[in-house]
């Protein structure tokens, strides 16, 4: 099974324009006989089965490791089906998608809805002579480190990884640790990596927050761990944000804010 979304409550309640697939197109992507075979394995009182009732310690460890080949093969399978979708619908899905300057020196790695905000900021900064970019994570688990390395321009010197979670007591959040490990295993020790948190509890992450991240990457002495979108006056991890930052919205855009309470929303 796949979890096919990375965002929370606020995003799920937005009104967005979407492109809906025709089911006939979807059938072409799937082996429906395999789907039926998979569904037939589900627990059903009409043909009951017992599974996972007990397993001794002498074989449990071996059993857990035996699934490794399935996880190792999965990125290539996902990549194959993404290619089919791209061919059919004209999209550009990949395990990791890069957006920005081909010769970027500063890059953000993130996933989910913050990428849309980051793209607006990238367009503005690159149009004004800077060289920045974004790596969008499409497949988080299983993580494909070699594909991440391919997506990062060779010119990159500094990376900020943004996680929408907090792991108290850990040296970094999950995506940050994956990126650091992938770069270390690939011998890319020339890249400096910092990690930040954003959007907890559906906290807004406006363009000013993304501007702040790229500004932090300019510094010689960067905060290794930081937050954006809030003012942290306790542990002082938050980055300073310019509330009068440039307007990155498309020309002619009208922005409105509606206030409601409870069921009014």
Q: Whereabouts are the PLM-identified features?
A:
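Short acidic, glycine/serine/threonine-rich loops at helix termini
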Residues: 13-20, 119-121, 145-147, 170-174, ...
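A general structural motif
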Residues: 77-93, 110-117, 137-145
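Glycine-/acidic-rich phosphate or pyrophosphate-binding loops and their flanking alpha/beta elements
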Residues: 83-106, 119, 239-251
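Redox- and metal-dependent alpha/beta enzyme cores, enriched for Fe-S-associated oxidoreductases
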Residues: 103-130, 143-150
């Amino acid at each position: 099974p796949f979890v096919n979304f990375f965002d929370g409550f606020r995003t799920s309640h937005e009104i967005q324009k979407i492109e809906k697939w025709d089911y006939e197109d979807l059938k072409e992507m799937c082996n429906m006989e395999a789907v039926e075979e998979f569904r037939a394995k589900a627990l059903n009182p009409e043909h009951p089965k017992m599974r996972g009732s007990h397993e001794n310690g002498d074989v449990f460890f071996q059993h857990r490791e035996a699934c490794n080949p399935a996880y190792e093969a999965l990125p290539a399978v996902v990549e194959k089906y993404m290619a089919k979708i791209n061919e059919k619908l004209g999209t550009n899905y990949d395990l990791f998608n890069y957006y920005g300057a081909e010769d970027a020196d500063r890059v953000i790695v993130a996933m989910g809805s913050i990428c849309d905000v980051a793209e607006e900021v990238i367009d503005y900064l690159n149009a004004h002579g800077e060289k920045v970019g974004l790596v969008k994570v499409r497949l988080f688990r299983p993580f494909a480190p070699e594909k991440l390395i391919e997506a990062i321009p060779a010119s990159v010197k500094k990376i900020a990884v943004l996680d929408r979670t907090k792991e108290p007591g850990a040296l970094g959040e999950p995506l940050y640790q994956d990126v650091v490990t992938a770069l270390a295993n690939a011998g890319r020790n020339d890249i400096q990596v910092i990690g930040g948190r954003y959007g907890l509890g559906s906290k807004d992450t406006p363009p000013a927050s993304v501007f702040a991240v790229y500004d932090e990457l300019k510094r010689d002495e960067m905060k290794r761990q930081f937050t954006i979108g809030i003012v942290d006056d306790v542990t002082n991890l938050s980055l300073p944000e310019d509330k009068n930052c440039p307007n990155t919205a498309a020309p002619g855009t009208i922005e409105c804010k509606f206030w409601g309470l409870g069921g009014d929303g």
